[in-house]
Amino acid sequence: MTDKNTRTEKIQPFSAPKGVPDYAPPRSAAFVAVRDAFITQAHLAGFEHIELPIFEETGLFARGVGESTDVVSKEMYTFADRGERSVTLRPEGTAGVMRAVIEHSLDRGQLPVKLNYAGPFFRYERPQAGRYRQLQQVGVEAIGVDDPALDAEIIALADRSYRSLGLTGFRLELTSLGDSNCRPAYRQKLQDFLLNLPLDEETRRRAEINPLRVLDDKRAEVREMTADAPLMLDHLDDGCRTHFETVTGLLDDMGVPYEINPRMVRGLDYYTKTTFEFIHDGLGAQSGIGGGGRYDGLMAQLGGQDLSGIGYGLGVDRTILALEAEGVTVGQERRVDVYGVPLGQAAKKAMAGIINDLRAAGISADMSYGDRGLKGAMKGADRSGSLYTLVLGENELDNGTVAVKDMRAHDQQDIALSEVVSALRAKLA
């Protein structure tokens, strides 16, 4: 007898954590298309893949990215593991690549070392459209050569990566942040300017630690106060100026359009000289879809050789949003070439063997499961998007054949079971 007062509590389903997007079909097709297009372009330019850990020692990012950055001071997912070691989910890729290059002595061979990576990165930000706590990125790093031609190659590669997807409504902004020779004098001049402004306590602290960070502040009141701030482009020494002019000249020669933005400051401290960002105005506030720059000095800062480097990170999530804003469709829903419809247990056993043989021959194939009749199973075939459907019942088994239905031409023929794989391979060639 059931107690009237007994209530069965409904089990609540789980949801993804806030700010962590799922890419489920059919949208996952766009995700794969964008990621793979970026990787393909990198491989065409001679970059080799490197697979990095999802988490690293916290000190790697504190030292490499910069303790005064928002990324390190506010946005990192940092925790103590069971051994009481401080580890951090990677917020960006360059520091991890440099750590791996140093650890595995990849910089002791031919230079530049050209590596590409892809995967998720993690930042504790306020979630909104285009800004996620888990962001997907494809990046490249070229390490060991201080050559403006390499800067131009990297920028052109990023530009070509976007255009390979059919994306057109973006623009490239670039500047130079100088180097250790000319930046200190500019830094002092900028700091003197900023400390004479009525800044709030946090912004003043940032101006004292790294005044360039203040120019990266997106608040309207801060941007208004810093409108007349001195600019790095006006304080480059001859070497940095020549480097930057060579980069822009090479981009002109390659037909890569760009705009010079003297106020640009990237969100990471390691950048020097050439710095760039790709902007898409169809995304609202989160308009940056990718960017990068040169980071001479980072390797030495992390305990390696004093070698230069340059790279970029292209945002997969925001690129998908940019494509959607332009009405550009990339990727196709995954379909199988062949779908099997077995009618009865004996047919199911035989069909499983056929499907396995088709897959072994490199033909994508699936089949109907359960005990659905012909009508229900054919609905599954239609939904699969298959080009051919195999129908196998008692009559076909007795005759040693299978009915092969062309789903586009809507015709059907019987083919011997022993020949079905070769016949379908010929039809799909």
Swiss-Prot record:
It is found in: Cytoplasm. GO terms for molecular function: ATP binding; histidine-tRNA ligase activity. NCBIfam families: hisS. InterPro entries: aa-tRNA-synth_II, aa-tRNA-synth_II/BPL/LPL, Anticodon-bd, Anticodon-bd_dom_sf, His-tRNA-ligase, HisRS-like_core, HisRS/HisZ, HisRS_anticodon. It is an enzyme of class 6 (ligase). This is Histidine--tRNA ligase. Belongs to the class-II aminoacyl-tRNA synthetase family. Homodimer. Keywords: Aminoacyl-tRNA synthetase, ATP-binding, Cytoplasm, Ligase, Nucleotide-binding, Protein biosynthesis. It comes from the Bacteria. It catalyses: tRNA(His) + L-histidine + ATP = L-histidyl-tRNA(His) + AMP + diphosphate + H(+). One of its GO terms (biological process) is histidyl-tRNA aminoacylation. Its EC number is 6.1.1.21. Pfam families: HGTP_anticodon (PF03129), tRNA-synt_His (PF13393). One of its GO terms (cellular component) is cytoplasm.
